[in-house]
Amino acid sequence: METVETLNEGLKRNYTLTITADEIRKRIDQEVAEAAPRVNLPGFRPGKVPAKLVNKMYGASLAQDALNKALQDGVQKLLSDKGEKPAMQPEIELTEGYELGKDAELKVKFEILPEVPEISFDDLKLERLTVEADNAVIDEKIKEFAEHQKSFDDSKKDHKAENGDLVVVDFVGKVDGEPFEGGTGSDMSVELGAGQFIPGFEEQLVGAKQGESRVLKVTFPEDYSVPYLKGKDAEFDVTVSDVRVPRKAEVNDDFAKSLGLESLDQLRDLMKGQIEQELNGLTRTYMKRKLLDQLADSYSFEVPSQMVEAEFNQIWRQLEHAASHEEDSEAALAEMEKERDEYRAIAERRVRLGLALSDIGAKNNVEVSQNEMNMLISQAAQRYNPADRQRFVEYLRQDPMMAAQLRAPLYEDKVVDILFEKANITDRAVTREELEAAIEAEEDSIGKHDHDHDHKEKASDKPKAKKAAAPKKKAAPKKKAAPKAEKKSSDE
């Protein structure tokens, strides 16, 4: 095998690789020898079909397999011999006009992972915004919890339904005067004001009494889940069989005991623990964002353009999806186009920051243990139906890239913990409102403060895509954390 370097510029590497016909022939002979024992033909004992006959029957497909393997092995040997670490899968192009029996010449193109420069962490300064879970906050949370545990009592016969009441109805839905599939039901409970039904349904039941019949006129939303009902006007013939009023929950020892606890004090302790966990999560989110901002400002090394392009494409697809659900999707898309360069800069920042975090983790011997990985797999499997969980686990164990994506957030959090230990941290007591406002202020700042490595937020918590006259720019969608640097095929 011969290799010739044709480009060495920055992170870009191009090679011409020649694999001799003799090497390919040896690989074909090996493929035939390995396939022969598995071939069964009438007149031959199992596994005793002559290699020449196997070659005659399956030679073309075996030759193609052998060529592909020879090319892949050649590329791997090239990378090993040159000590190159590609950032993504190399591009391989076989010279046009190749014929079996001749030398194979291929062009190999890739970008290498950059060397991440050493920086000092002595200047890392962070402010930890802390919120106390005081008695007032605990009482308010318990009150909210009690309201969600509410039960209903029978009302007087002449009671008119109000918001908050539970109305039990039988109904027949009609479109163009004809009942439609799924539009008929009985003994359905409707909590007025809960907003669980199509617009207008609950509102038109306000004032209804037990035994009363009404015709409710509604319009199905344009985004309704049933296609043939989208945007359709409909009427529901409704009969109210019962109206029940909410029972006010009293927060006391009896309420706590109804939840299986010993006392109200135990409920308060549990609620305090949950609130503190939530507040600590918000505090960490703010600190992590500030930390990543400082790290991003500290690094300026070149990053692989392929990784940036892949990251940008991922951002852009998510933005296009969000824009397609705007009232004026064309205006939202046009606004996105104006900011294309900014989103590309965000993609570059993400890649650089991901590589830096991976490098810091590697130099500090950060690892995700097998027990931790098993726990991550188990947690991820819970999102699937019980019948599908084992298949998911088996698939994950066979797919290194999927496993890397699952491992990445925990790996990154371990790196962040190390950096927290190295940083100079000062504490400042704030209210929850002030902490959330500080996080939102970070969220609203697009370029510099794009917090792509924060896993604590859901996509639904992000601002909606920008409309034509909106004053605020849409933040780039979140991505998964960067894995260790040795995962070459992706920055994920």
Curated annotation (Swiss-Prot):
Domain comment in the entry: Consists of 3 domains; the N-terminus binds the ribosome, the middle domain has PPIase activity, while the C-terminus has intrinsic chaperone activity on its own.
Role, per record: Involved in protein export. Acts as a chaperone by maintaining the newly synthesized protein in an open conformation. Functions as a peptidyl-prolyl cis-trans isomerase.
Pfam families: FKBP_C, Trigger_C, Trigger_N
EC number(s) recorded for this UniProt protein: 5.2.1.8
Gene Ontology CC: cytoplasm
Similarity section: Belongs to the FKBP-type PPIase family. Tig subfamily.
Protein name: Trigger factor
Key words, A-Z: Cell cycle, Cell division, Chaperone, Cytoplasm, Isomerase, Rotamase
Biased composition (Basic residues): 464-482
InterPro entries: PPIase_dom_sf (IPR046357), PPIase_FKBP_dom (IPR001179), Trig_fac (IPR005215), Trigger_fac_C (IPR008880), Trigger_fac_C_sf (IPR037041), Trigger_fac_ribosome-bd_bac (IPR008881), Trigger_fac_ribosome-bd_sf (IPR036611), Trigger_fact/SurA_dom_sf (IPR027304)
Compositional bias annotation for Basic and acidic residues: 445-463, 483-492
UniProt keyword Chaperone, yes or no: yes
PROSITE patterns linked to this entry: FKBP_PPIASE
A GO BP annotation: cell division
Reactions accelerated catalytically: [protein]-peptidylproline (omega=180) = [protein]-peptidylproline (omega=0)
Enzyme class of the recorded protein, top EC level: isomerase
Gene Ontology terms for molecular function: peptidyl-prolyl cis-trans isomerase activity; protein folding chaperone; ribosome binding
Region of interest (Disordered), ranges: 440-492
Subcellular location: Cytoplasm
Domain PPIase FKBP-type: 164-249
